[in-house]
Structures are given as structure tokens and as C-alpha cells.
Amino acid sequence: MTQTPEALTTEQFKQAIIDKGQYYHIYHPFHVMMYEGKATQQQIQAWVANRYYYQINIPLKDAAIMANCPNQRVRQEWIQRMIDQDGEYPDGGGREAWLRLAEAVGLSREQVISEELVLPGVRFAVDAYVNFARRASWREAASSSLTELFAPQIHQSRLESWPQHYPWIDDKGYEYFRSRLSQARRDVEHGLTITLDSFTTHEQQQRMLEILQFKLDILWSILDALTLAYVHNEAPYHSVTQERVWHKGLFK
């Protein structure tokens, strides 16, 4: 009879989660290019405009987690993530801070909000994340947020390198990165507690690690799409037209 593998201890499981950081998108060539000061203004703008679509969908992901969660105490803590991103009226929260970043790199907020620069590959990756959060159990969807473990490092790297390499970016644009340094650390504590308490068998733990890899795949795929379009100059339909003919704004 096949013996069921033993579950990891809490510390082993936590370390296995941390080890996934080697696949975080901070190591993607597109991000390395930006960090090293080798990106053009157009490439920076493209990243900001496309990442906006990710930013505005994070509250929808968090709303889906809360909608599936029967635990009031968890919802009371989780809702802070939505407030961070959407703000409390009339404050625009993280979304408004991202639009200030867009203006700081030379984009108009109208162009960014229109989503006309959002590549199909980016849209599909982000939509897959939101749909996962809607369909998965709230515990599984919550655990996917643990890429935040690695987020402070990526935000700090931008704050350290971008002002040096891209002096044309207005300093007011960096507020989003500054705010996320503390917010991400707080979010990690909550998400990690839920994850370590929820996945206690070998099978559950391995599934959770696959879920975390799924989230890492999403972040990596976003940069793959940007690389194809803005490094290799092979945007969708590049072989037949230079126009942005891909679909836009179907689901607003």
C-alpha cells in the first residue's frame, strides 16, 4: 500500500513558500532592464499603462475573496486591502497614486484609464487571476496573495534605482511604491497566517504551492507580453499592421 507523504512542518511549509521567491518577476529581464536604467521612456510608459490594469483589478480579486469567505473576522481584516487600492471616497487610494505615476512618466491619465495601451496578453493574465479568485475557495484565493512576501524588495528596488536612472520622472510619481512598503508587509502577515493554518496535509500544501506558482506565472506573463511588444517590437498583429487593433474595454 502506498504511504501518504507526511505534511511539512509549519516552518518547512513557510520556507517552501519563501523559496518560491526565486521565480518572482523581479528577476524577469524586463524588470531587470528597468532596474538597471536601460529602459526607454516608451518602455517605462508601457509598463505603467499595462500594470494599471492589474492595479484596478486587485480590488475585484479581493472582493471575490471576501464574497466567498464566511468568516467575519477575516473579512474585517481583508477589506483593508480594497481600501488601500480603491481609497475611501473622495480619496482615490492606490489607483489614484498609480495615475500620478502615469503622469510622472509622461502619460495622460485619460489615456491610461481608457486602457487603450493594455496588451491582450496582459489582460488575459490579469483576468485569469480575478476569475481564479471568484471560483476558488477563499482560503486558496487568499494564499495566492503571498507573492506580497517578495513585493517590498521590488518596490524598494524601484525607489533606489529609478530616480538615479530616470531623472525625468517626477518624484511625486513614487508615492505608490512608498506606500506599499508598509502595506505589503502588513498584508503578508495576515495572508501567511491564513495559509499556514489552512493547509496542513501534504496534498493541501502541495496544491497551495501550485497556486502560488500560478500567481507567479501571471506576473511573469505580464512582463513576457511587454517584452514581446516593446523590446522585440512584436506587438499583437505586428506582421499585418502597426495599429493597436486588439480588443479594448469590452468588460467595463
UniProtKB/Swiss-Prot annotation:
The gene is pqqC. It catalyses: 6-(2-amino-2-carboxyethyl)-7,8-dioxo-1,2,3,4,7,8-hexahydroquinoline-2,4-dicarboxylate + 3 O2 = pyrroloquinoline quinone + 2 H2O2 + 2 H2O + H(+). GO terms for biological process: pyrroloquinoline quinone biosynthetic process; sulfur compound metabolic process. One of its GO terms (molecular function) is pyrroloquinoline-quinone synthase activity. It comes from Acinetobacter baumannii (strain ACICU). Ring cyclization and eight-electron oxidation of 3a-(2-amino-2-carboxyethyl)-4,5-dioxo-4,5,6,7,8,9-hexahydroquinoline-7,9-dicarboxylic-acid to PQQ. Gene3D superfamilies: Heme oxygenase-like. Its EC number is 1.3.3.11. PANTHER family: 4-AMINOBENZOATE SYNTHASE (PTHR40279:SF3), PQQC-LIKE PROTEIN (PTHR40279). The lineage of its organism: Bacteria, Pseudomonadati, Pseudomonadota, Gammaproteobacteria, Moraxellales. Belongs to the PqqC family. Pfam families: TENA_THI-4 (PF03070). InterPro entries: Haem_Oase-like_multi-hlx (IPR016084), PqqC (IPR011845), PqqC-like (IPR039068), Thiaminase-2/PQQC (IPR004305). Keywords: Oxidoreductase, PQQ biosynthesis. This is Pyrroloquinoline-quinone synthase. Pathway: Cofactor biosynthesis; pyrroloquinoline quinone biosynthesis.
